[in-house]
Regions:
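Negatively charged, low-complexity tracts enriched in Asp/Glu with abundant Ser/Thr
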Residues: 2-32
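Short aromatic-glycine-(Arg/Gly/Cys) micro-motifs in beta-strand/loop hairpins
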Residues: 30-61, 79-81
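Helix-rich interaction surfaces within compact, conserved domain-sized segments
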Residues: 160-194
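Short glycine-rich, basic-tinged beta-strand/loop micro-motifs
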Residues: 108-118, 152-165
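A short, charged, amphipathic alpha-helix used as a generic interaction element across diverse proteins
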Residues: 67-82
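N-terminal, charge-rich interaction modules
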Residues: 89-115
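Intrinsically disordered, low-complexity charged/polar segments
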Residues: 82-88
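Acidic, aromatic-enriched beta-alpha/helix-loop junctions
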Residues: 59-61, 124-147
Length: 194
């Protein structure tokens, strides 16, 4: 609860787990009457989003209905997770590691790679780990731990974050806050989204 899932996050989640054997199909905002389909569709007459599953005999069962599409997406996510017996994927982000360091002309660039999915049930941990890793990058620059190897003749120090999956709203808020913190320093944040 509390954190809402986007359609894109659900699609990413399904894609990420597409190697898992699935005897059913998942449909977003579409009513499909084939065996073992699960999904949600918009019932325009009732102005609601209906989450459904289709039985072996191709009967449509309404599981729940919501006013907001976001709630239908969340419900569908829970059903898919239960069906797939998918455990939440642990966040993999080594906070003590600088992923890569590079120099160009007058810039020093630290690369931070985040290949984790953004999902409601792991978002909190994801944000904490990302924040901690970012803090470590900033500390690395502030305490000039790069000098011995790269010297100290840089105009700009850039923390370049690459995301494999689009961050949630809270993820984007964290980045905006970090950018603000670095405003009057010789450090900056470069964010690369998929």
């Amino acid at each position: 609860g509390g954190i809402l899932m986007t359609k894109q996050e659900l699609l990413d989640f399904l894609k990420f787990n597409s190697n898992k054997p699935r005897y059913y199909t998942v449909h977003l905002n579409k009513k499909v009457l084939e065996q073992f389909a699960i999904g949600y569709y918009q019932d325009l007459s009732a102005n609601r989003f209906i989450v459904y599953e289709v039985t072996e005999r191709q009967q449509l069962h309404e599981k729940a209905s919501f006013e907001r599409e976001k709630d239908a997406i969340e419900e569908l996510y829970e059903i898919v997770k239960f069906r797939c017996r998918i455990k939440s994927i642990p966040i993999q982000l080594d906070v003590s590691e600088i992923d890569a360091i590079g120099t160009s002309d007058k810039d020093l660039e630290l690369l931070l790679i985040d290949g984790n999915l953004w999902l409601p049930d792991t978002e909190e941990e994801h944000l904490l780990r990302l924040q901690e890793k970012l803090n470590n990058y900033i500390y690395f620059l502030e305490s000039k731990q790069y000098v011995e190897r790269y010297g100290d003749n840089f105009d700009k120090k850039v923390i370049h974050i690459t995301f494999q999956y689009s961050p949630s709203d809270n993820g984007l808020a964290l980045l905006a806050a970090a950018q603000k913190t670095l405003q009057n320093t010789d450090m900056s944040l470069k964010v690369e989204l998929p």
